[in-house]
Amino acid sequence: MIQGIYSALSALRALGQRLGVTANNIANMDTEGFKKSKAVFEEASPYGVNVTIRRIETQGFPLPSEEGINKVCESSNVDIKEEMINLITVPHAYAANLKSVKAEDEILGTLLDIVDR
């Protein structure tokens, strides 16, 4: 029983990290040469999720520089569509895990009530 709560809490922490990475990517999308990051989830033993933050090194688009006509700088490699998908899906996954914690809590409460009789 308790393992379900641990798994859900681990997922909540991981989703919080993914949301933080997404927010950082969006905040820096107009920064020259910024490289986006990605939160990668991996199964943790015995229960839960490990998160690895990886920097994505793909190049952005070339932009004309303000320093001169012959100079070129690089845009960020942030894809706003990808980041918006994260902003939509993460809260739904977060809510689902919260419901899981609540259900486990109610089940444990019921079991304790039965044992207490």
Predicted feature residues:
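Amphipathic alpha-helical polymerization modules
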Residues: 1-117
